[in-house]
């Protein structure tokens, strides 16, 4: 009987946690609250700067993360860590 009670409590807690954390994120609001009028064109400098900033940031973060990542797994034996590198087993 205790086992059944534990299973019910576990199921209820999982349900409550999943209800609080949605699996899909809501789309972000990408439009400014106040923008240029319909007949007014956006400034070329502002548009170019925003485009450069958004394209440069992800590339830099990816490069930094890939160069600092460790290649081996310290917890496992050395021969297990060598398997992804293409080395032959002992």
From Swiss-Prot:
Native source species: Homo sapiens (Human)
Keyword tags: Glycoprotein, Membrane, Repeat, Secreted, Signal
Gene: MUCL1
InterPro entries per UniProt: MUCL1
Low complexity bias locations: 25-36, 44-68
Ranges: Sequence repeats: 46-53, 54-61, 62-69
Coiled coil regions, renumbered to chain: none
Region annotation (Disordered) ranges: 25-68
Annotated glycosylation sites: 23-24, 30, 34, 46-47, 51-52, 54-55, 59-60, 62-63, 66-68
Record's protein name: Mucin-like protein 1
PTM per Swiss-Prot/TrEMBL: O-glycosylated.
Record flagged with keyword Glycoprotein: yes
Chief site of localization: secreted
Signal peptide coordinates: 1-20
